[in-house]
Amino acid sequence: MKDKFELVSKYSPQGDQPRAIEQLVAGLKKGLKHQTLLGATGTGKTFTVSNVIQEVNKPTLVMAHNKTLAGQLYSEFKEFFPNNAVEYFVSYYDYYQPEAYVPQSDTYIEKDASINDEIDKLRHSATAALFERRDVIIIASVSCIYGLGSPVEYGEMLVSLRVGMEISRDQLLRKLVDIQYDRNDIDFQRGRFRVRGDVVEIFPASRDEHCMRIEFFGDEIERIREVDALTGEIIGDREHVSIFPASHFVTRPDIMKKAIVNIKAELEDRLKVLRAENKLLEAQRLEQRTNYDIEMMEEMGYCSGIENYSRHLSLRPAGVTPYTLLDYFPDDFQIVIDESHVTMPQIRGMFNGDQARKQMLVDHGFRLPSALDNRPLRLEEFEKHINQIMFISATPGPYELEKNPDVIEQIIRPTGLLDPIVEIRPIQGQIDDLMDEINDRVEKNERVLITTLTKKMSEDLTNYLKEAGVKVQYLHSEVKTLERIEIIRDLRLGVYDVIVGINLLREGIDLPEVSLVAILDADKEGFLRSERSLIQTMGRAARNENGRVIMYADKMTDSMRNSISETERRRKIQIEYNEKHGITPKTIRKEIRGIIAATSAADEREAIKQHDLSKMSKKERDIFIEGMEHEMKEAAKALDFERAAELRDALLEIKAEG
């Protein structure tokens, strides 16, 4: 079992980083439960945390408040720890409409979701890694505090295979069906197996390229091979392989029988209550739906919405804390909360929203009361899972400061870059003034972020700038995660010079090309113009040597005064450090890269151009083309015709080139 973290970087800690690393490590070794790193934007907080992880050498959960930020962190940690298990665990829904009931209009809304297969694979990879090794960093969104199947069941149900092991082919097939693998000899993909005589090929749920070929001689495993699932090329021989379940809600047949008995008993009790209250329609509905689910579980081992029975499937009493990803970690793991001033309030609020919706379903006979136990953790339950935790933020919130008021500061940037200069200008004539500033930045090949207070103002401003010939895009809450990453990436590439948004430009977006942040209506007090929000927004201009913030306001609010004062305090410390060490601030141009396959915004043709086909052998070229053709067919099958057409055109170009 590999258990040592190995940080790979051409950089060594600079500026404030060595002191911050030393203090955090000392605190962890001393047994401090809560620590807070106040790290200004662009000071290399991820690098600092990476050094701490290497030094302390414990499995680590890094939590972010949205998929975009989690994707960026995943990419960065993957670069720092190429030889360790860096995993990604976020909600696997591209689209999610939760089950709900609106009594006023008697409207039942069925659960509707689109699952992202790539993210599902990464989730399985994350939990499998925790069973196989200790050098694991999992980057997760707050969805990791939602209910997951029992880690005990998950671990006990894994199928462990060794060369020389006595097991018949049919016994193996039954075991695979028990852990929710499907047999499919034609359409072979993740979570499936196929059989050819004495050879069984298994496609693990945590992989998307390599499968395992198990060769039998009688009732004994003669050979285990790792094989490229697409080409059939042998990757290598294996002495041992663990096949993890294809679902996190997997249950042993004996436990399933007990669970069904308990579900039937709960149904009987609930029907008595509903009939006593003269809710006959609700009783009939609940009986019909639950009996259908029970039949499915008896026949297939699972049903749609099986997570609503998770309490019974793990044989837990009512009200007990549900299993989550946190239960899959060993006891000595550590948690890092990124952008904690946003993430902690999210953790606090998730339980209440979930319960309000589910209670309505229970009251009207759509679900049994036990469905209420398939839920996210309460804050106090989350706190019980904490062994040691580090809060990371440029603006720590009240929760973090209450837990440990001794904040560790990281103000100096290794690049020598300073916090931006802040100017206040009158609201009168702000758009004309802004146009001049945009034109000035465009000439220098720099980018601009503009933050407004309302959707209407964002739309109007975007349209006005477009008519004036500015390459501008509006980033709003209805933009999907993948499109959002694409827009941010396009800003860096110069497809756009300006992005207009409301509350979407603050935390953790790394944009060194941005030299101007314009804050409209800066004097309108509220959560979008609070001291913490303003400091975060200003920080978007701190990665460029020409960074500047313009606040358009007619009066000075306390939030403006405090945020400007804090920025000036940091700027003073940074200038003194630079003068003492002879550092000249210089913008660091980071490589513009995709984040993960599931959230990459790269254009297909650009991606294909990166493969120098002229240097490939005929066999390599044929394999590459075959892979693209497979991808094109999969895209068409998924009704993603635009992507399929792009791949088709690229294939035609490649074939035309000979």
Swiss-Prot record:
Residues 622-658 form the UVR domain. Residues 26-414 form the Helicase ATP-binding domain. CDD domains: DEXHc_UvrB, SF2_C_UvrB. GO terms for cellular component: cytoplasm; excinuclease repair complex. Residues 430-592 form the Helicase C-terminal domain. Transmembrane segments: none annotated. GO terms for biological process: nucleotide-excision repair; SOS response. InterPro entries: Helicase/UvrB_N (IPR006935), Helicase_ATP-bd (IPR014001), Helicase_C-like (IPR001650), P-loop_NTPase (IPR027417), UVR_dom (IPR001943), UVR_dom_sf (IPR036876), UvrB (IPR004807), UvrB_inter (IPR041471). It comes from the Bacteria. Keywords: ATP-binding, Cytoplasm, DNA damage, DNA excision, DNA repair, Excision nuclease, Nucleotide-binding, SOS response. SMART domains: DEXDc, HELICc. ATP binds at G39, A40, T41, G42, T43, G44, K45, T46. It is found in: Cytoplasm. The keyword Lipid biosynthesis does not apply. Pfam families: Helicase_C, ResIII, UVR, UvrB, UvrB_inter. A motif (Beta-hairpin) lies at residues 92-115. NCBIfam families: PRK05298.1, uvrb. The UvrABC repair system catalyzes the recognition and processing of DNA lesions. A damage recognition complex composed of 2 UvrA and 2 UvrB subunits scans DNA for abnormalities. Upon binding of the UvrA(2)B(2) complex to a putative damaged site, the DNA wraps around one UvrB monomer. DNA wrap is dependent on ATP binding by UvrB and probably causes local melting of the DNA helix, facilitating insertion of UvrB beta-hairpin between the DNA strands. Then UvrB probes one DNA strand for the presence of a lesion. PANTHER family: UVRABC SYSTEM PROTEIN B (PTHR24029:SF0). Belongs to the UvrB family. The beta-hairpin motif is involved in DNA binding. Forms a heterotetramer with UvrA during the search for lesions. Interacts with UvrC in an incision complex. HAMAP family: UvrB. This is UvrABC system protein B.
